[in-house]
């Protein structure tokens, strides 16, 4: 029996997968990567910037996170490479405190992010730009992954955040928590048609030395996407 090749991945999505991360979740839990002969281990981190930093520090081999951090590192001269893309849109809602009922009221709000430069930051900046609100009119706060952002929203110590659709639905089902969805998935897609999205990325050195592993990783993602489409 051939031994599976090991590969270490950092999950910028944190310890859990959301709707945005369905392809990665499917590849992991449906055994798509295992079928390609890979032994994948995940390390959860807070955001795409941390995921790429883990790659550059040789803590992991491949990052899963937003496109933005990879492009930024590449523009700064870091030897990074994108392997495969996940999707072309984010399954998120803009959740706000109950008192914020119009888009004009977003000026001056505190807005929770995974971290500065993370996918949630990139998408939030695009939303603000589309609404013709200056970035300096927002109190940006790096809070952490969705559970931490939701906790801050519920505590009333933050005004606004982009939250996964399934988590937003759970919040909306509780009429007494003081929160509501200001912009849903379809409205955000109309507002920002071209959205940042998740990618798998690595270093140029790893790409040169481990092409077989990366080919298998990509084929596993294709398997997962087809399985989701067929379901």
Predicted regions and their residues:
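Short, glycine-/small- and polar/acidic-enriched structural segments
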Residues: 2-136, 140-143, 155, 159-165, ...
